[in-house]
Amino acid sequence: MLYLVISTPLPTKPSEVRINRQKLWEWAQPLIDRQIIKDECMYAKVGRGAIALFDVSSHEELNNYISQWLEIIPAEMQIIPLLSQEVTHRFLSDHVT
């Protein structure tokens, strides 16, 4: 199950969360290494925030990772479910008339 997660941190001075921002990337690295954050797809947004592409087996697994992320940097999270390229191609080829 693919999800694009977009974080918008709560308003604070960037200098007040610098250490936590570093902790977020340290937390994410093992997930990137294990392809839970797919294709090394975690990027900082211009200004503040980050995006990540999660590949998980359940909503519960995603919820666990989001909860861990929020413990490091409190934020509003936008979660967008996605279809894989394989599923998209199969859907399109099955529905061609």
What are these regions (language model features)?
Residues M1-T97:
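Conserved, structured core segments of small domains
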